[in-house]
Amino acid sequence: MTTPCPCGRTSANSAKPAKTQPLPFFACCGPYLNESVPAPDAHALMRSRYSAFVLQRADYLLATWHASTRPAALDFAPGAKWLGLDVRSHRVLDADHAEVEFVARCREAGRATRLHERSRFVRESERWFYVDGDQF
């Protein structure tokens, strides 16, 4: 059995169109986190960054954070369990700028929380980077 991607992206099952199957990690965010290929757009980068949070991959998160806003280091909340990602919208502003609005659900210290953010992304040298975001 293959491991489903943490981002939760699904693919319609051709045998049963009403049912969706989670994409396996190796066919979804895996190639981005393994640096085989760069994320092709801001939407894919957003999903891969969520997967990196689930997998506690600070190296990938820092590498995909724009240098102008990148922190020196990342700390993960101990015991935090990411529960799901809902991408609400992906808006291309121009060839090198985009926004992605999402809600990420998490359980921390037994308490459910959600992060609702509109993130800004920029493309430089054919690579997309997270810049910052507005939380709701």
Curated annotation (Swiss-Prot):
Disulfide bonds: none annotated. This is UPF0225 protein Pnap_0466. It holds the Pfam family YchJ_M-like. Belongs to the UPF0225 family. It comes from the Bacteria. It comes from Polaromonas naphthalenivorans (strain CJ2). HAMAP family: UPF0225.
